[in-house]
């Protein structure tokens, strides 16, 4: 049985293992059979026999299968540890007395670490009290041509991300994170359904890119002879559902944005959007906090998130809120209002060294947000609702009911990153058209994140939409908030640059 000493040994390991595969085929022994008679999972046996006395025979014959992650071969008795997908492990014993010399020699010659094998035999406990299957026969189920990483060397992040399948095999934490994500998604759906929300599906391919300020991925439909866009948000279609009479709807699905990738951003990401008729952004902020806390309880088991530095992050209790313009004014030491000219904001940005592209037609609203992010956003550690945004950067949001020049929008910040956003939705079709036209002018001036004018959406609003609040929350970022991990660790298969080979 072979095991790699270093990554440099892999080509030789591959050659040796491939030769074993060819020999098995030549001998008429299938290294990749279509089926084996597995009767129990390893976890089931662990559960059925939690505390057998040492050197006990149960008389139960079983068939088990798993990946060989440890092996020790001696004269007439070989030991191996099998592992199955959920991480459960069990010892198997290959004995000369039970299988004979030919089968014992074949085990020693044919089986490598990483192979998946089937073992049939009796459930026993060894002399040391280890629950085991004493084989009376065995079979290779899948011959591994590549060796597993060396057990005592930790996988680096690049390998974990590029070869998540290896990460899942060797690292229990990777399997835990994958299961936590599934549990989080299930808990989100459950919490919304308890509140009467209906899950719907809306188009991934759209004829217009709308619903968010972001650069889209563009593709071409040969059948329609037209460009289509991978959606950047489902918002405009979900609002059509509200117009049609679905008072509480949500969608949990993929969005795509042709932008940067870093520790908090991914070009492809899972997004939750909700819309609730007859609610305001105050209502959706409350629902969002309750939702996150309920999901933490159900899927993670705690509202205190352990961080890499050994501290904890508390998601419990009420969360603070602040307003964008007053908090920016306080950080700068001078008053900034919706009437502050863009020229002054550019001067402040230059003075502070804030890098803002000058060729994208940014006006007052975008400059305020960039300055706020630089001076305030990067300091927000505790869960915080940031409220009341500039009009021109929130074209789908209702004007504030009492503050001139801002909209009823909040962003939720957790540990310095934006986790969710919520609006009191703009439902006046005339004002919405004016906002879209302003976005079109921004696009013409070079803003590649400006929204397109969607005539069909405007037509829907013209039929009448009830007062509505909407929210959006990235599931990947929710996992970050609940686990303390980076976005690439919370995504099972994140996008990575291809190797040249």
Curated annotation (Swiss-Prot):
One GO BP: lysyl-tRNA aminoacylation
Cofactor binding mode and count: Binds 3 Mg(2+) ions per subunit.
Recorded GO MF terms: ATP binding; lysine-tRNA ligase activity; magnesium ion binding; tRNA binding
Compartment annotation: Cytoplasm
InterPro entries noted in UniProt: Aa-tRNA-synt_II, aa-tRNA-synth_II, aa-tRNA-synth_II/BPL/LPL, Lys-tRNA-ligase_II, Lys-tRNA-ligase_II_N, Lys-tRNA-synth_II_C, NA-bd_OB-fold, NA-bd_OB_tRNA
Binding site for Mg(2+) 1: 411, 418
Cofactor: Mg(2+)
Keywords noted in UniProt: Aminoacyl-tRNA synthetase, ATP-binding, Cytoplasm, Ligase, Magnesium, Metal-binding, Nucleotide-binding, Protein biosynthesis
Matching PROSITE patterns: AA_TRNA_LIGASE_II
Keyword Protein biosynthesis part of the UniProt annotation: yes
Protein origin, superkingdom: Bacteria
Enzyme class, UniProt record, top EC level: ligase
Family annotation (CDD domains): LysRS_N
Annotated binding of Mg(2+) 2, by residue: 418
Catalytic activity: tRNA(Lys) + L-lysine + ATP = L-lysyl-tRNA(Lys) + AMP + diphosphate
EC number, as in UniProt: 6.1.1.6
ATP-binding recorded as keyword: yes
Pfam families reported in the protein's UniProt record: tRNA-synt_2 (PF00152), tRNA_anti-codon (PF01336)
Oligomer and partners: Homodimer.
Stated family: Belongs to the class-II aminoacyl-tRNA synthetase family.
PANTHER family: LYSINE--TRNA LIGASE, CHLOROPLASTIC_MITOCHONDRIAL (PTHR42918:SF15), LYSYL-TRNA SYNTHETASE (PTHR42918)
Protein name: Lysine--tRNA ligase
Originating species: Mycolicibacterium gilvum (strain PYR-GCK)
């Amino acid at each position: 049985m072979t095991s790699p000493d270093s990554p440099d040994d892999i080509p030789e390991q591959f050659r040796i293992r491939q030769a074993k595969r060819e020999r098995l085929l030549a001998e008429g022994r299938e290294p990749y059979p279509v089926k084996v008679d597995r009767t129990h999972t390893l976890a089931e046996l662990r559960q059925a026999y939690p505390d057998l006395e040492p050197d006990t025979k149960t008389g139960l014959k079983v068939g088990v299968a798993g990946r060989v992650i440890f092996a020790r071969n001696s004269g007439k008795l070989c030991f191996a540890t099998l592992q199955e997908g959920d991480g459960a492990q069990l010892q198997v014993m290959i004995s000369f007395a039970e299988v004979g010399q030919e089968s014992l020699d074949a085990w020693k010659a044919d089986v490598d670490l990483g192979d998946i094998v089937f073992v049939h035999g009796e459930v026993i406990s060894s002399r040391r009290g280890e629950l085991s299957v004493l084989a009376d026969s065995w079979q290779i189920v899948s011959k591994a041509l590549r060796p597993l990483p060396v057990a005592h060397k930790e996988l680096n992040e690049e390998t974990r991300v590029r070869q998540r399948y290896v990460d899942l095999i060797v690292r229990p934490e990777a399997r835990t994170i994958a299961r936590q994500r599934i549990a989080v998604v299930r808990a989100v759906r459950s919490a919304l359904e308890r509140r009467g929300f209906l899950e719907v599906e809306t188009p991934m391919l759209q004829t217009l890119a709308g619903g968010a300020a972001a650069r889209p991925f563009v593709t071409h439909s040969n059948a329609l002879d037209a460009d289509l866009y991978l959606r950047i948000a489902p918002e405009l279609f979900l609002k059509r559902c509200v117009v049609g009479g679905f008072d509480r709807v949500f969608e949990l699905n993929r969005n795509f944005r042709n932008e940067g990738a870093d520790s908090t951003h991914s070009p492809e990401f899972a997004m939750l959007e909700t819309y609730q008729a007859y609610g305001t952004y105050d209502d959706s902020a409350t629902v969002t906090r309750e939702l996150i806390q309920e999901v933490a309880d159900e899927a993670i088991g705690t509202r205190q998130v352990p961080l890499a530095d050994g501290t904890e992050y508390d998601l419990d209790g009420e969360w603070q809120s602040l307003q964008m313009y007053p908090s920016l004014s306080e950080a700068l030491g001078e008053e900034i209002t919706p009437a502050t000219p863009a020229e002054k904001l550019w001067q402040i940005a230059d003075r502070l060294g804030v890098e803002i592209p000058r060729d994208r037609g940014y006006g007052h609203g975008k400059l305020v947000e960039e300055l706020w992010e630089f001076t305030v956003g990067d300091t927000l550690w505790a869960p915080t609702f940031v409220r009341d945004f500039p009009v021109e950067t929130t074209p789908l949001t209702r004007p504030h009911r009492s503050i001139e020049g801002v909209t009823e929008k909040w962003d939720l910040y957790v540990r310095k990153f934006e986790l969710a956003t919520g609006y009191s939705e703009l439902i006046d079709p005339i004002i919405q058209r004016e906002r879209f036209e302003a976005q079109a002018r921004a696009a013409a001036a070079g803003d590649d994140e400006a929204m397109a004018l969607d005539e069909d959406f405007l037509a829907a609003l013209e039929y009448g939409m009830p007062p509505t609040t909407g929210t959006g929350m990235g599931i990947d970022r929710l996992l970050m908030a609940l686990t303390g991990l980076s976005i690439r660790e919370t995504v099972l298969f994140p996008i990575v640059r291809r190797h040249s080979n």
